[in-house]
């Protein structure tokens, strides 16, 4: 298997109105890779949560903060890294405060402030968090579902 990848990097102001731009870019990349509609929606939710956390918690009132997003496009997976240089938090402690989760728990039983991390871990195949000099969230979604054929044309439909 090849380890070749294409990388797409974005740096946006840490403001809520820019999260939509990240979602649109992600949707385009994931669609081009062949993810299903449901997988793309899962990706958008998880990445939006990571970006929203950076916007809301990293810089507090500082309007000059930035969020960096990197998409690693591999043959078998999409890796998304969301990073900020703002305030860090203790991920292990936060996870301990939140969990454990069981299927019998309903969403309204989850601890306040931890739903984003829970969603990221539930919707993505891998999630890693580093909290040195800001917070970096690395998420991976493997491509294993049906691929969307992007070479489909009207002519292809007419011949079938």
UniProtKB/Swiss-Prot annotation:
Protein name: Serine-protein kinase RsbW
Gene for this chain: rsbW
Xref: Pfam families: HATPase_c_2
Induction: By heat shock, salt stress, oxidative stress, glucose limitation and oxygen limitation.
Catalytic activity reported: L-seryl-[protein] + ATP = O-phospho-L-seryl-[protein] + ADP + H(+); L-threonyl-[protein] + ATP = O-phospho-L-threonyl-[protein] + ADP + H(+)
Biological process according to GO: negative regulation of DNA-templated transcription
Lineage summary: Bacteria, Bacillati, Bacillota, Bacilli, Bacillales
Species of origin: Bacillus subtilis (strain 168)
E.C. number: 2.7.11.1
Record has Transferase as a keyword: yes
């Amino acid at each position: 298997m090849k380890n070749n990848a294409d990388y797409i990097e974005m740096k946006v102001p840490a403001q809520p109105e820019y999260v939509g731009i990240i979602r649109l870019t992600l949707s385009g990349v994931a669609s081009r890779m062949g993810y299903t509609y449901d997988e793309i929606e899962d990706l958008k939710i998880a990445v939006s949560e990571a970006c929203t956390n950076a916007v809301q918690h990293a810089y507090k009132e500082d309007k000059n903060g930035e969020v960096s997003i990197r998409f690693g496009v591999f043959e078998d997976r999409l890796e998304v890294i969301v990073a900020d240089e703002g305030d860090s938090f203790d991920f292990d402690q936060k996870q301990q405060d939140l969990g454990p989760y069981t299927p019998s728990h309903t969403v309204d039983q989850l601890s306040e402030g931890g739903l984003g991390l829970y969603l990221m871990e539930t919707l993505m195949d891998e999630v890693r968090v580093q909290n040195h000099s800001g917070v970096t969230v690395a998420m991976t979604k493997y491509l294993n579902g049906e691929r969307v054929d992007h070479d489909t044309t009207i002519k292809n439909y007419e011949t079938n």
